[in-house]
Design a protein with these regions (language model features):
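A generic structural signal for well-ordered alpha-helical segments
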Residues: 5, 81, 115-116
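Surface-exposed alpha-helical segments enriched in charged/polar residues
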Residues: 36, 75-79, 110-114
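Catalytic His-Asp segment of secreted/periplasmic serine-dependent ester chemistry enzymes
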Residues: 94-178
Length: 178
């Protein structure tokens, strides 16, 4: 998505700060220290947050993170970004192969949409990918969580229009305006 935006003319540097198996609570603990090093010195910034799937995975018969803690963690990140003048965008957890995880991720996604709505933060729901045959086949053919290229292209198709609108409205002018 960032590469496509650069190709469309946005002068953009993207930092992926994901850590495998990190939950929203883990991200909330470390996000500020990691982003403050990168987002400074007068440029325009934005924070894209995509968490939640690791929260809904069962461990010992329970989700790794309760929905309430997940929502509080995301709210804390969004409030911290807002306090620093950094616009935020949230991408909901995508569906996987496990039906229980799909249902829990969809419920969490609805909660995340609410957290974002209260803060006027754009939110991208990815739950519709559960009905996308390409996404479903690619996730099933892999590790049950991650698709390959065609699946990620489906995810990007959901995120990209919202991301570009967010860039233009909140982060930086569109290439045509600069």
């Amino acid at each position: 998505v960032a590469t496509a935006a650069r190709g469309a003319g946005w002068d953009l540097t993207a930092y992926a700060l994901g850590v495998r198996r990190d939950s929203s609570v883990d991200v909330a603990r470390r996000w500020l220290a990691e982003t403050e090093w990168r987002l400074r010195n007068g440029d325009r910034y934005g924070v894209v947050l995509a968490v939640g799937l690791n929260d809904v995975v069962l461990e010992d018969g329970r989700p790794r993170v309760s929905p309430e803690r997940s929502l509080a963690a995301v709210a804390g990140v969004l409030d911290g970004a807002s306090a620093r003048g950094w616009p935020a965008l949230v991408v909901g957890p995508p569906p996987v192969s496990d039906a229980g995880e799909i249902a829990r991720a969809a419920d969490l996604s609805a909660g995340l949409a609410g957290v974002c709505a209260v803060r006027a933060v754009p939110f991208v729901s990815t739950t519709g990918l559960a009905a996308d045959p390409v996404w479903v086949a690619e996730v099933a053919a892999g590790d049950a969580y991650h698709p390959s290229t065609r699946g990620y292209a489906r995810l990007a198709a959901l995120v990209e229009p919202v991301f570009r609108r967010w860039l233009a409205e909140r982060v930086a002018p569109s290439p045509e305006e600069s």
